Amino acid sequence: MTGWTINAAELRIPRRSRIAAHRMIVIADPSGRAVRQLNGLASWFDNELHAWRHKPIGYLPTDRLRGYDTKTHPRTFMPINGAVLPDWNIAPAIATGAARVLTDDLTRDEVDLRLAPALDALRRINALARGPDGGAGLPYPFMGFGRNSNSFFATMLHAMGFDHPTFANAAWLVPGARGLLLPASEIR
């Protein structure tokens, strides 16, 4: 592979297991280093810090599902199954099928063009309920069973026109994997 890539990847729960997965969009630079992610995360607004915070899974009635771009919210960068530390190189994950290339050989500007419809969908998801920093998104389903972060991933795929990838040694539980958070006719 040459150039920038847009990829599908997972955070395994527990790490390196096949029990469950949180799926995400990962952008890698030409060296294969993951430099950006789009994630849907269980969130709550911290009134003391005046900022949204996130946690591994939602379980409180006040938890919200919001979308994040690590370009503007770097603390939402999640561990990537199969990637190599210290720089989150995803080439080994791609080689084993733990991550999938959605499109490759892109310039940085082409990445921005491909991400534009997904970022628009992210903003629209967050704006579904009033709240600070673009909105409060959607109620997070108890323990993630329902439309959740994997539904956010499915919505991002749909917005960019990508098919759902198949991961090697797929996780057994991926709730919300094919659900969309916005009507299909309104995405793109």
Question: Where do the protein language model's features map onto the residues?
Answer:
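Non-catalytic ligand/cofactor/substrate-binding and regulatory segments of enzyme domains
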Residues: M1-G144, A159, L181-R188
